[in-house]
Amino acid sequence: MLSRIQNYTSGLVSKANLLSSKALYYGKVGAEISKQIYLKEGLQPPTVAQFKSVYSNLYKQSLNFALKPTEVLSCLKNIQKNELLKYGAYGIQLIGFYSVGEIIGRRKLVGYKHH
């Protein structure tokens, strides 16, 4: 019984090592491709003026919604099914990116050492 458990866990560990090495390889390939696209397309970070305009518009809209909550409710009531699916997919992607960032930051899949 113990030997079966050891064989199972060793097989599981070897598969995990294989998957992690593949993930590392494809991550590096993706980073290199992204770097080449960044250089060829001439991409650049947004300017300070662009940041200011985006965040000032966001602030104005959030202030407007805070002052007139009935408009928020009317907007939510008028959402179509396709829009709801699209925004739900965006939300799932954001949660996924956040979760991956947390995993990378902790350097482990679950929890911190002191908890």
Swiss-Prot record:
Which gene name belongs to this protein? ATP20
Post-translationally, this protein is described as follows, namely: Phosphorylation on Ser-62 impairs ATP synthase dimerization.
Q: Where are the Phosphoserine modifications? A: S3, S62
Q: What is the effect of changing S62E?
A: Inhibits ATP synthase dimerization
Q: Which organism is it from?
A: Saccharomyces cerevisiae (strain ATCC 204508 / S288c)
**What family is this?**
Belongs to the ATPase g subunit family.
Keywords for the protein's UniProt record, in alphabetical order = Acetylation, ATP synthesis, CF(0), Hydrogen ion transport, Ion transport, Membrane, Mitochondrion, Phosphoprotein, Transport
Q: Name one GO biological process term.
A: protein-containing complex assembly
* Matching Pfam families: ATP-synt_G
Q: Which residues carry this modification: N-acetylmethionine?
A: M1
Tell me the protein's name. ATP synthase subunit g, mitochondrial
Q: What is the effect of changing S62A?
A: No effect on ATP synthase dimerization
